[in-house]
Amino acid sequence: PDPTLASAKAGAKQMLDFKPDCIIALGGGSAMDAAKIMWVLYEHPEADFMDMAMRFMDIRKRIYTFPKMGEKAYFIAVPTSAGTGSEVTPFAVITDESTGVKYPLADYELLPDMAIIDTDFHMTAPKGLTAASGIDAVSHCLEAYASMMATDYTDGLALKALKTIFEYLPMAYDNGQTDVVAREKMANAATMAGMAFANAFLGVCHSMAHKLGAFHHIPHGIANALMLDEVIRFNAAEVPNKMGTFPQYDRPHTLERYAQVAEYLGLKGKNNAESLENLIHALDKLKARVGIKPTIRDYVPDEQSFLAQLDEMTRQAFDDQCTGANPRYPLMSEIKQMYLNAYYGKSFKEEPLPDAGESADDEHNFKQAYRREKSGVIGTAKED
């Protein structure tokens, strides 16, 4: 479950009562993230959550100075699932239950003092958690490698982790309670992926997954899996020719970067475009292999509910902290389009509403169409 600000405040209150000098965060990403916020509120009860959640362009040059951590308690993170990498990252994702907004907090003060990677804690993880966590780690690798803040150091971690996941996630999924080697490899891969994105940061896939999960209560790893194909295709497009977000990032070269990933995984094609398709196909096979369904609609069957919340979900995804490091900066219309494509599993195009005298039912199959009367358009699914 998504940790809430209220639960973190309640935990911090208990800490203030007995004043620990060491905090051990034992659990998956949600438990570790909640513990990080408890740690902050325990050491600095005066800290304002919205100040800490303030967005920034560069984590090293932010307007808000995060409070100094570690003066009261040492923080130890012990993951029990192989996915989030929170044990080695300066991030904590928390949901404000009063608004439903999911905030990814980021500052190097949130980095745990120690991480203990012990496979014994992973052996009883159920298949669903193994799959969702594993694909979350895949998205960490791909977004860190494509990030405009990627370096030689993060590249090596991301590539090695990704190759390990492709090899060992199916084994951990099938025989997780007995295959110690697969669990150990996945635990190490998730931590390596965490080290990669702790320095290179993430992108719009995570921005969209944060909001998809918050609005429709989809597990975070599944939400990333559902958006991954669309984001890869979006990032690999050859436009725009120039990026202006970071001056040191001359222009997008993401297609080439994805082709390098494909080559490292043994999926090289005749050219970069074919390598990209090979990579996407391999990702789809891996997701299906571990039981992840292909579309948002498989998890959110209420079409009208999804469409009713689409605009606000799009706005919040655009404003998410992770969007800034994406190699191609998206427009809100492009984020919305990716959500729609991921929902229906097809490419969509908006068309004018039919004339009043024309029966929409005669022209459009409502299983493959959506209506938004207030905007005066309908969207029709198109096969790729």
Q: What function would you assign to each model-found segment?
A:
Residues 83, 191-224, 319-325:
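Glycine-rich phosphate/pyrophosphate-binding beta-alpha loops
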Residues 305-384:
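Short, amphipathic C-terminal "tail helix"
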Residues 6-13, 17-120:
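Glycine/threonine-rich beta-strand-loop-alpha-helix active-site module
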Residues 9-12, 36-39, 135-143, 159-170, ...:
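Predominant activation on well-ordered alpha-helical scaffold segments within soluble catalytic domains
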